[in-house]
């Protein structure tokens, strides 16, 4: 059985191998502090300045163009300690924390976090130590949380578990066995109740609520499939296939009120991710645009592609930087 240290070494190798340095003027790298890595997901507050991202060792960083990265919050009291730095902090994710999915409640300013090993958390607008909401449902531990989004119409939080059988340190085992124990959950802040909405998902890595709150999309990384779960309307409470056209989808992010979504995608050959790309789909699951990103990230596992004010913010699981790609106005390359 793959040891945790071996898994970490492999993931670091995958993130750094085949690195290609792009001279594209529209692309910018923002290296995270050297003691941390893997800006996996992004969130943007109501000020519209900078962004927030979760990194290894259990920290949430805030980036402002004038100051760069600053500490905004931490998942545990240990997250600020030196032994949560570097590869040790990655190895001690069960103590330090590892934010995987983050999203703001746009009305309250609260930042919700799906921490991979430590459960669902919330952070006040002031930042600081996160408050744990829960690490289980119906008495069963989550094991491995991943994606998260907040319904912009109701404030209800939707989040996923990549697996209900394997923990983050066993991710390669889960992939090798094609584990299908992932779940989609709903957390209602008004009742403080967590509900299981979907089960039997294959590597449910990301989720995104539509701008009108009528449905939530759930990616199945292992199956190269995205499901749609209906929140409202005549199909409420049911699910269906949304698209099979995106290879190994990770996080999904809605694009404002356009009805479209960005999906982080790779081609997963055995355990080696290749050909990372950003894929835009519409509300019918049709692919509108594909942006190849191998020249900017090499063969690495993209975790998120998030559009904000004309830029794509691109994250990775273990990489040393956040990528920002300026979109060309009116461009929509055929794929």
Swiss-Prot record:
Gene3D superfamilies, per the entry: TolB, C-terminal domain
Protein name in UniProt: Protein STRICTOSIDINE SYNTHASE-LIKE 12
Gene assigned in the entry: SSL12
Residues bearing carbohydrate: 80
Induction or repression: Upon potassium (K) starvation.
Keyword Amino-acid biosynthesis belongs to the record: no
One annotated Gene Ontology cellular component of this protein: Golgi apparatus
Organism of derivation: Arabidopsis thaliana
Family classification: Belongs to the strictosidine synthase family.
Pathway(s) annotated for this protein in UniProt: Alkaloid biosynthesis; 3alpha(S)-strictosidine biosynthesis; 3alpha(S)-strictosidine from secologanin and tryptamine: step 1/1
């Amino acid at each position: 059985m793959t040891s945790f240290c071996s898994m970490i070494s492999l993931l670091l190798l995958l993130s750094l191998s085949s690195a290609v340095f792009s001279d594209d003027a529209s692309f910018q790298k923002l290296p995270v502090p050297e003691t941390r890595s893997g800006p996996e997901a992004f969130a943007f507050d109501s000020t519209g300045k900078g962004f927030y991202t979760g990194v290894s060792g259990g920290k949430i960083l805030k980036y402002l163009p004038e100051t760069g990265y600053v500490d905004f919050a931490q998942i545990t009291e240990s997250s600020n300690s030196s032994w949560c730095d570097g590869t040790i902090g990655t190895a001690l994710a069960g103590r330090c924390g590892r934010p995987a999915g983050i999203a703001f409640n746009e009305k309250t300013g609260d930042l919700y976090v799906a921490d991979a090993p430590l459960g669902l958390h919330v952070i006040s607008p002031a930042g600081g130590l996160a408050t744990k909401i829960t690490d289980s449902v119906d008495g069963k531990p989550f094991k491995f949380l991943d994606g998260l989004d907040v319904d912009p119409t109701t404030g209800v939080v939707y989040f996923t578990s990549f697996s209900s059988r394997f923990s983050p340190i066993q991710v390669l085992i889960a992939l090798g066995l094609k584990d299908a124990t992932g779940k989609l959950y709903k957390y209602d802040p008004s009742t403080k109740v967590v509900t299981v909405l979907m089960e039997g998902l294959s590597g449910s890595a990301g989720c995104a609520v539509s701008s009108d709150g009528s449905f939530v999309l759930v990616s199945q990384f292992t199956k190269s499939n995205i499901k749609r779960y209906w929140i409202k309307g005549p199909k409420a409470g049911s699910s269906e296939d949304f698209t099979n056209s995106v290879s190994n989808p990770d996080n999904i992010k809605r694009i404002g009120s356009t009805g479209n979504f960005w999906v982080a995608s790779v081609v997963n050959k055995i355990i080696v991710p290749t050909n990372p790309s950003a894929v835009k789909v519409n509300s019918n699951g049709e692919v509108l645009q594909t942006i190849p990103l191998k020249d900017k990230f090499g063969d690495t596992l993209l975790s998120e592609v998030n559009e904000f004010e004309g830029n794509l913010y691109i994250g990775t699981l273990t990489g040393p930087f956040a990528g920002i790609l300026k979109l060309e106005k009116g461009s929509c390359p055929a794929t």
